[in-house]
């Protein structure tokens, strides 16, 4: 039996929706916006109400201008100061709190990247609310879905906090359109520098390959490769596929590759069109980071390897024979 909502209930629901407002904290590198921010904006629009974006940095005019064109954003707030170099959470938190106080946002969110995971717990603590991490769906303005038990179960969380603070899994939401928007831009609230931490420098690994979390094709290697030198087999294959290269935690812990290549529950979450797992057994922690891939190909000489349970295609063979053969075939095409 269906029961119609009373007119009064509908009016109250509509009134609540009008008062919803969300602040998205933009992650960027001054001259370019991190792709996960566009996914976070899409999630924010699902909440209803007005969506604003806060951009803090040293020379972030270009990012602010780009955000004004993104569909779904009503306002872009810009804060430029030397203390925001490196986007340190100690400096960003007072800025976010001042912005929230000025506009009375009901929701504050960022992508579930290293940036968001570092920043939002501090913001939530200062607001005296409990944060919700790594959401994959939004059911209503106060109800969210996230994974638990390494992705083997879904947990629906109802949040009654005065301000909802949450991080968004980028692979669970489409990227917002980068055109069609007409947001206004204005200066954000000014705050005094905290200066308890200082940004010194960062050294980034340069690569001509796509960034791991945004690549359409990912080739990942595990302990089965036996050494870091053997990862060259994957690099050669990836070059033919214009793919990013990842690794399991076992390969990272063994010192084969740096930890920024790790895919899994404690690494990066990816959902490419094609994921090729080479010499990876398929531990539950690794599956949590890649099982949303559209097509999964597994190469392993052990037919009982758990990776085959989630793979769309499996090759039971010696990777040291199969991978070079695949590379040679692709070179001829």
Swiss-Prot record:
It comes from the Eukaryota. Changing residue 266 to M: In GA2A; decreased electron transfer activity. The keyword Membrane does not apply. GO terms for molecular function: electron transfer activity; flavin adenine dinucleotide binding; oxidoreductase activity. The modification Phosphothreonine is found at residue 93. This is Electron transfer flavoprotein subunit alpha, mitochondrial. The modification N6-succinyllysine is found at residues 59, 69, 85, 158, 187, 203, 216, 226, 232, 301. GO terms for biological process: amino acid catabolic process; fatty acid beta-oxidation using acyl-CoA dehydrogenase; respiratory electron transport chain. PANTHER family: ELECTRON TRANSFER FLAVOPROTEIN ALPHA, ELECTRON TRANSFER FLAVOPROTEIN SUBUNIT ALPHA, MITOCHONDRIAL. FAD binds at residues 223, 248, 263-266, 281-286, 300, 318-319. Its main location: mitochondrion. Belongs to the ETF alpha-subunit/FixB family. Its cofactor is FAD. It is linked to Glutaric aciduria 2A: An autosomal recessively inherited disorder of fatty acid, amino acid, and choline metabolism. It is characterized by multiple acyl-CoA dehydrogenase deficiencies resulting in large excretion not only of glutaric acid, but also of lactic, ethylmalonic, butyric, isobutyric, 2-methyl-butyric, and isovaleric acids.
């Amino acid at each position: 039996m269906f029961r119609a909502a009373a007119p009064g209930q509908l009016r109250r629901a509509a009134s609540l929706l009008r008062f919803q407002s969300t602040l998205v904290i933009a992650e960027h590198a001054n001259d370019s916006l991190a792709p996960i921010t566009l996914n976070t904006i899409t999630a924010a629009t699902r909440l209803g109400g007005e969506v604003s974006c806060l951009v803090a940095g040293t020379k972030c005019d270009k990012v602010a201008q780009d955000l004004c064109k993104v569909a779904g954003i009503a306002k872009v707030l810009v804060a430029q100061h030397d203390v925001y170099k490196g986007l340190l959470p100690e400096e960003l938190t007072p800025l976010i709190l001042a912005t929230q106080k000025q506009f009375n946002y009901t929701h504050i969110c960022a992508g579930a990247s290293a940036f968001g995971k570092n920043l939002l717990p501090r913001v939530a603590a200062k607001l005296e609310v409990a944060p919700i991490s790594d959401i994959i769906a939004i059911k209503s303005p106060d109800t969210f879905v996230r994974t638990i038990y390494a992705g083997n179960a879904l947990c629906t969380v109802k949040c009654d906090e005065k301000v909802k603070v949450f991080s968004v899994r980028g692979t669970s939401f489409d990227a917002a359109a980068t055109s069609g928007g007409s947001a206004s831009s204005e200066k954000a609230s000014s705050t005094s520098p905290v200066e308890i931490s200082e940004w010194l420098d960062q050294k980034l690994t340069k690569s001509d390959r796509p960034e791991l979390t945004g690549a359409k094709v990912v080739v990942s290697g595990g302990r089965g490769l036996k050494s870091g030198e053997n990862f060259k087999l994957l690099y050669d294959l990836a070059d033919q596929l214009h793919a990013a290269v990842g690794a399991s935690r076992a390969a990272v812990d063994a010192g084969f590759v740096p930890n920024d290549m790790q895919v899994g529950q404690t690494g990066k979450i990816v959902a490419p069109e094609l994921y090729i797992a080479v010499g990876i057994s398929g531990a539950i922690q690794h599956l949590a980071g890649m099982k949303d891939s559209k097509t999964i190909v597994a190469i392993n000489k052990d037919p009982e390897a758990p990776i085959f349970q989630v793979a769309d295609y499996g090759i039971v063979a010696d990777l040291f024979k199969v991978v070079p053969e695949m590379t040679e075939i692709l070179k001829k095409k």
